Curated annotation (Swiss-Prot):
Cofactor(s) essential for the protein: Zn(2+)
Catalytic residues (positions): 60 (proton acceptor)
Binding site for Zn(2+) 2: 60-61, 235, 297
Source organism, top-level taxon: Bacteria
NCBIfam families for the chain: PRK02126.1
Gene giving rise to this polypeptide: rnz
Record key words, sorted: Endonuclease, Hydrolase, Metal-binding, Nuclease, tRNA processing, Zinc
Taxonomic source organism: Deinococcus radiodurans (strain ATCC 13939 / DSM 20539 / JCM 16871 / CCUG 27074 / LMG 4051 / NBRC 15346 / NCIMB 9279 / VKM B-1422 / R1)
Protein name: Ribonuclease Z
Positions annotated to bind Zn(2+) 1: 56, 58, 162, 235
Length: 331
C-alpha cells in the first residue's frame, strides 16, 4: 500500500512523505524539502529515506535540505539519491560543498544527483571523502522506463511549466493478484502452499496429494487488482493546453496531490506566475479520473476564511477534494 502525508503548515513550505509498503519491504520517498517540513517527521524516518525528489529548486522547496543532509551526510547503510530537473546538480552540489569538510578524508559516503529532462536522466556522483568537490559525470541514460523501480514501487516524472524546468511525479504500486475466497468455497478447496505456486505461474499444482492443471484453477480463483497510485504536482501553469496534455498522463492515478496557490478569482495572477487555482486543480482531477484530490501549497495572501471558499470552489467541480489533514479547524 501507499501511505502519504503532507508535511508543513498551510501557507508555509510543504513537502510530501510517501511510504510504499508491500508487506515484504518498504520504499520511502521525500518529495520536495521546504523549510521546517521535516519538523514533524521522526528522525528514523528521515534517515530511512531512499530518494529525495525535487519538483524544482526554488527556495520554498529546498530550504529544509540542510536538515535532511545533516542526519544523512555520511550515510553508508543505503544509497543516497537526489532527483530534480535540469540544473539541479549545479545547485545541489553547492549545498553539498557548503560546509567545512576538514574530516572528509575519513568519511566514505557517496551521493548521486540525477537531472531529469524529457529524453534522459543525467547522473553525477559526488564523494564525501573528496569533500564533494568533484562532479563525476556518470552519463545520460535514455528515459525508456521509470525513473525508480523497486519491488514495491515505480516512479515516473511529468514535465511541468513554471517559467523554467519543473517536474511532477507519478508513483504506482505493482498490481496485486488476490485469491477469491468465494472461488475456494465453490470448488471446495482449502488454502495451502499450492496457492503460492498458482500465483507464481506453475503449470500444475499439488492439492491434497493430487496433481491438477493450474490454468482452470487460475481462471476460477485469481483476481488481478491494480496497485495504489498517487501523483504530486506543484508550482505549474495549468491552462487549457496543459489540462489537455496532463490529464491523459495522470489517467488512472488514484490520488492527486496538487498545489492550491490561488483562488479562482485570481486566475490571471496564477497564469502570470505559472501557478494554479483550486478550480483548475479540481478540473484536472476530474478529467484525469482521480478518486481523490488533496490540495496543498497555499499562498500567504489568503486567510483561513478564504481557504474554505477556495475548497468549496474545488469541491463544486470535484467533490472529493480536500486540504491536508487538520489544515482547517474543525476538520
Amino acid at each position: 500500500m501507499l501511505s502519504a502525508a503532507v508535511l508543513g503548515q498551510p501557507t508555509r513550505d510543504n513537502a510530501l512523505w510517501v511510504t510504499a509498503d508491500s508487506g515484504k519491504g518498504q520504499t520511502r520517498l521525500l518529495l520536495d524539502c521546504g523549510g521546517h517540513t521535516l519538523d514533524t517527521l521522526p528522525l528514523h524516518e528521515v534517515q530511512a529515506t531512499d530518494h529525495l525528489l525535487f519538483s524544482h529548486l526554488h527556495m520554498d522547496h529546498i530550504a529544509g535540505f540542510d536538515d535532511f543532509f545533516r542526519v544523512n551526510f555520511d550515510r553508508q547503510s543505503r544509497e543516497n539519491h537526489l532527483w530534480g530537473p535540469p540544473g539541479a546538480a549545479r545547485i545541489l552540489a553547492h549545498r553539498l560543498q557548503g560546509y567545512w569538510w576538514n574530516h572528509a578524508p575519513q568519511l566514505r559516503a557517496t551521493w548521486r544527483i540525477h537531472e531529469v529532462d524529457d529524453a534522459a536522466v543525467h547522473t553525477w556522483r559526488f564523494e564525501l571523502h573528496e569533500a564533494f568537490e568533484i562532479a563525476h559525470d556518470e552519463g545520460r541514460t535514455p528515459r525508456t522506463g521509470p525513473l525508480i523501480e523497486t519491488p514495491h514501487l515505480r516512479v515516473d516524472a511529468v514535465p511541468l511549466q513554471h517559467q523554467g524546468p519543473c517536474l511532477g511525479y507519478v508513483l504506482r504500486e505493482p498490481g496485486r493478484v488476490n485469491v477469491d475466497p468465494a472461488g475456494l468455497t465453490r470448488l471446495d478447496l482449502t488454502p495451502g502452499p499450492w496457492l503460492a505456486a498458482l500465483k507464481a505461474g506453475a503449470e500444475e499444482v499439488e492439492i491434497a496429494g493430487e496433481r491438477r492443471p493450474a490454468a482452470p484453477l487460475r481462471a476460477e480463483l485469481l483476481r488481478e487488482e491494480a496497485g495504489d497510485s498517487l501523483a504530486y504536482l506543484t508550482d505549474f501553469l495549468l491552462d487549457e493546453a496543459e489540462l489537455a496534455r496532463l490529464a491523459p498522463l495522470l489517467a488512472g492515478v488514484r490520488t492527486l496531490y496538487l498545489e492550491a496557490q490561488y483562488a479562482p478569482a485570481d486566475a490571471d495572477l496564477a497564469a502570470r506566475n505559472h501557478h494554479t487555482t483550486t478550480e483548475q486543480g479540481a478540473t484536472l482531477a476530474a478529467r484525469a479520473g482521480a478518486q481523490e484530490l488533496v490540495l496543498l501549497h497555499l499562498s500567504r495572501r489568503y486567510r483561513e476564511a478564504d481557504w474554505r471558499e477556495m475548497l468549496r470552489a474545488a469541491q463544486a467541480i470535484f467533490p472529493a477534494a480536500r486540504f491536508a489533514e487538520s489544515w482547517l479547524r474543525g476538520t
